Amino acid sequence: MAILAFQKPDKVLMLEADSRFGKFEFRPLEPGFGITVGNALRRILLSSLEGFAINTIKIEGVEHEFASVPGVKEDVTNIILNLKQVRFKQVVEEFENEKVSITVENSSEFKAGDISKYLTGFEVLNPELVICHLDSKATMQMDITINKGRGYVPADENREYCTDVNVIPIDSIYTPIRNVKYQVENFRVEQKTDYEKLVLEITTDGSIHPKEALKEAAKILIYHFMLFSDEKITLETSDVDGNEEFDEEVLHMRQLLKTKLVDMDLSVRALNCLKAADVETLGDLVQFNKTDLLKFRNFGKKSLTELDDLLEGLNLSFGTDISKYKLDKE
């Protein structure tokens, strides 16, 4: 079944951008697509991007999160609440987790920036965040573990990383996205005024550029929708390798090559000649070269020119090797 042409943007406009904030514009969109695309991207951005956070802590002399530390104003519960807010950026690609031992002494405040001097693979993005206040003679010894994760993980799920009874699991806020807002506005295309413009604003913690965050969210959505794009939808477990690299261009070409020629508005003569030769889809057609086509019964140069123009308009060409697109002829 042929799909009617959709009004869609040729590209995404980046209206504003720095390391933490980006404003993007998609236009024109069909009526109703603004909220469809905007809401889907917002939910993925807020819940599903990867980041780094503290998942366990150990404070010398403390057995559980409801205890207090001698000489420290805040109790352990409040210290944990503050540690959950510390934001990290990976600076050494090989480091996806790191455990550090921290000693705080001769200081009235323990800030997030004080963790930096103990780190090898990460950078603290909010160094001015105060973790706790100490008396002048107080000393605090703390071990923390930083790891990679997605979205939000509660303390109970981090319990598996506790190596001994005095290690305390904490909630981990991995998402690098601080806020996402979108709005849908009317947009005019020629004489029609009911098209839409989607304006998307993304605020990150600085560990990822807003443009990269948007790209990652789009890839996650496309990867999931790809499961519904095949003509074969079954109740069986998929055999697709979960680690297989996903290529948007390959997916687009794969779907294009599956298009049936009967839906391409060809002349009856050309269509009948191709049908007689069992050439039913664009994928079947592009595998032939022009010489082979002219050998088909009743196939002439006029039909060849018609097909040549068709493929040129779709950025396809004769004699194409389509094996990498893994098409299954049904």
From Swiss-Prot:
Instruction: Check the record and name the InterPro entries matching this protein.
Output: DNA-dir_RNA_pol_insert, DNA-dir_RNA_pol_RpoA/D/Rpb3, DNA-dir_RpoA, RBP11-like, RNAP_asu_C, RNApol_insert_sf
Record's keyword terms, sorted: DNA-directed RNA polymerase, Nucleotidyltransferase, Transcription, Transferase
One Gene Ontology BP term is:
DNA-templated transcription
Keyword Ribosomal protein applies: no
Recorded GO MF terms: DNA binding; DNA-directed RNA polymerase activity; protein dimerization activity
Top enzyme category = transferase
User: What GO cellular component term, any one, is given?
Assistant: cytoplasm
Family the entry assigns: Belongs to the RNA polymerase alpha chain family.
Its function, per the record, reads: DNA-dependent RNA polymerase catalyzes the transcription of DNA into RNA using the four ribonucleoside triphosphates as substrates.
- NCBIfam families per record: PRK05182.1-2, PRK05182.2-2, PRK05182.2-5, rpoA
What does the entry note on its domains? The N-terminal domain is essential for RNAP assembly and basal transcription, whereas the C-terminal domain is involved in interaction with transcriptional regulators and with upstream promoter elements.
**Protein name per UniProt:** DNA-directed RNA polymerase subunit alpha
